[in-house]
Amino acid sequence: MKKREDTRVVVGMSGGVDSSVTALLLKEQGYDVIGIFMKNWDDSNDSGFCSATEDYEDVERVAQQLGIPYYAVNFEKQYWDKVFTYFLEEYKAGRTPNPDVMCNKEIKFKAFLNHAISLGADYVATGHYAQLQELDGEYRLIKGADANKDQTYFLNALSQKQLSKVMFPLGHLQKAEVRKIAAEAELATATKKDSTGICFIGERDFKEFLQTFLPAQPGRMETMDGIDKGQHDGLMYYTLGQRQGLGIGGAGEPWFVIDKDLERNVLIVGQGYHHPGLYSDGLWATDMNWIAKEERTSPFTCKAKFRYRQEDQGVTVFPKEDGRAFIQFDQPQRAITPGQAVVLYEGDRCIGGGVIDKIHRENA
């Protein structure tokens, strides 16, 4: 075993409080710490929006406070090729992608990890709220102690090889404790607001942003029975279960997006939160990743999340060949969204996940 002072840990620093405290804790524990700021998005063309510059200045301030070396590394090309292109393709296909899962898989724990290793890193560390356990040479991904902040949902696509090189120093902490540690150490980012939204969009208007890259194709809105309900702005702007922005007036319960008919460019809508068209009994998933050393091949029961922060739901998983799985729900689920991640759990252990491809209804 290497001594701590001889163990180099490269921390992915975003300019936020979580990654700042990650660097602080590792430094206090005696590791050889280097901070790296990942520049994934070229925002030089975005008028009036340049949070990356501010974020890097915060990284500089914190790194100087901690007395650790820091660098900025540009991953714009990898990000465009691996994350953003995927993001656009999914929207074109009428789905609602989850770029965070892809960003973790391809950028933070691949491009960044490889770069860190080239700097002589033994490990990389991030401010994710997740925990790792090693048992007989196998790495287990465990939910973060703060149930409200647990981020294993976004880490479901990682491999044993990646996890063997990773540290999550915040995994055992509550968010409030992290803020307290930052305040006590007087870190420059102690009171900085948590970032929201997709990393490359920041706080901008999503519709406007998407229009820059994908031309909108307006079309009709209809009920499941084919009754005309007006016009939509472009299928890519809507997600299943969405209520806002439909512009359907009249009395009675609100209207929701139920489905997208890509061939006809029609948005299918239904009235009422519990409209039967919003519910499904199962789903097909693609790109299944099994975190354990051994791949699952026979059916089993476990828990699942179909969106971030959702309560765990009971399911039966039927793994298929070619990286697909059929996942049957114990209870019908509302507004399952193709393109999002389905993530599987046994107790607090995240065992893997995949991409929701299509929903299944028993009576359809």
Curated annotation (Swiss-Prot):
Enzyme Commission no: 2.8.1.13
UniProt keywords, alphabetically: ATP-binding, Cytoplasm, Disulfide bond, Nucleotide-binding, RNA-binding, Transferase, tRNA processing, tRNA-binding
Disulfide bonds: C103-C199
Residue segments, region Interaction with target base in tRNA: 98-100
Presence of keyword Metal-binding: no
Site residues (Interaction with tRNA), renumbered to this chain: H128, Q340
Annotated ATP binding sites: G12, M13, S14, G15, G16, V17, D18, S19, M38, G127
Region described as Interaction with tRNA: spans on this chain: 149-151, 307-308
GO MF term (any one): ATP binding
GO biological process: tRNA wobble position uridine thiolation
Main localization (coarse): cytoplasm
Record field: catalytic activity: S-sulfanyl-L-cysteinyl-[protein] + uridine(34) in tRNA + AH2 + ATP = 2-thiouridine(34) in tRNA + L-cysteinyl-[protein] + A + AMP + diphosphate + H(+)
Pfam family, one: tRNA_Me_trans_C
Leading EC class: transferase
Catalytic residues (positions): C103 (nucleophile), C199 (cysteine persulfide intermediate)
Subcellular location: Cytoplasm
General function of this protein: Catalyzes the 2-thiolation of uridine at the wobble position (U34) of tRNA, leading to the formation of s(2)U34.
HAMAP family: tRNA_thiouridyl_MnmA
UniProt protein name: tRNA-specific 2-thiouridylase MnmA
Lineage: Bacteria, Bacillati, Bacillota, Bacilli, Bacillales
